[in-house]
């Protein structure tokens, strides 16, 4: 059995859909790291920090188990977009995407008793212009909350994606194909 060390509903749904036996363990992480580095390095550091925090707090309860740590960020060019703190920040992030593109970087660390596997994947989504009413509803109803870069591929954004380069599961927060290869 896999232990998903994350409160992410999207990641849990991806594992269920892939028929991977898992148990979800929610944990509050401090994800505040310096964003003045490459987005690729940033998302990897976040995953390693999640592992450190989880193991320092709950490690003794999960010895010799298969643990999965993951994180996703959105970047536009080299600008890192994490989770919006409020509606103002959500509108700013969405304005950067409107009629343009955004890349989702998803990293995971699979810790097994016999090995560690680290994966970094990228999916780029290209958007047509957002409908102003749909955008307002999305933000004002707080649907952006908890979403890296305010991107909701399975909701608001799906109506505006013109094409994508990369796997949808990566955009949803976890590269399932790569994970399955190492389970």
Curated annotation (Swiss-Prot):
CDD domains: Maf. Keywords: Cytoplasm, Hydrolase, Nucleotide metabolism. Its EC number is 3.6.1.9. GO terms for molecular function: nucleoside triphosphate diphosphatase activity. The active site is at residue 71. Belongs to the Maf family. NCBIfam families: maf (TIGR00172), PRK04056.1 (NF003141). PANTHER family: BIFUNCTIONAL DTTP/UTP PYROPHOSPHATASE/METHYLTRANSFERASE PROTEIN-RELATED, BIFUNCTIONAL DTTP_UTP PYROPHOSPHATASE_METHYLTRANSFERASE PROTEIN-RELATED. This is Nucleoside triphosphate pyrophosphatase. It comes from Campylobacter jejuni subsp. jejuni serotype O:6 (strain 81116 / NCTC 11828). The lineage of its organism: Bacteria, Pseudomonadati, Campylobacterota, Epsilonproteobacteria, Campylobacterales.
